[in-house]
């Protein structure tokens, strides 16, 4: 997945962080689940899947994006709706880019429907 999220990305040049306004980084992007693993594991029917099906669902390539190390560490397993600030409650607090969040919240909701359908389809097999 790391290769997928870094395709066409130059890790050797300073890059503006798309999620954290004013921040830059020089490194590879980290892999982040758009819909968290915790959320997927709690979806209706997930527990009825075989381990192989669960892994296939958790590794659905559509459900990954690349984030800077700082952004990924800050977000953890929060939804994009709940992830509002980097270093929240500190003097260095930064609001996550509203445009980025809005785009990712929309994508997250789309993926929740896609993943739920994938679960339902697996359970029909």
List each model region and its residues.
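Catalytic cores of phosphodiester-bond-cleaving enzymes
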Residues: 54, 58-125
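Betabetaalpha-Me/HNH-type nuclease active-site subdomain
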Residues: 1-81
């Amino acid at each position: 997945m790391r290769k997928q999220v870094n395709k066409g990305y130059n890790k050797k040049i300073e890059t503006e962080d798309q999620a954290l306004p004013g921040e830059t980084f020089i490194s590879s992007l980290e892999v982040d689940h758009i819909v968290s693993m915790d959320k997927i594991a709690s979806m209706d029917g997930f527990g009825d899947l075989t381990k192989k099906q669960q892994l296939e669902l958790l590794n659905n390539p559509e459900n990954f994006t690349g984030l800077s190390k700082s952004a990924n560490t800050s977000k953890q397993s929060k939804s994009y709706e709940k992830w509002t600030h980097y270093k929240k409650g500190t003097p260095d607090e930064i609001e996550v880019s509203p445009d980025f969040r809005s785009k990712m919240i929309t994508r997250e909701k789309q993926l929740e429907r896609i993943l739920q359908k994938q679960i339902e389809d697996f359970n029909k097999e």
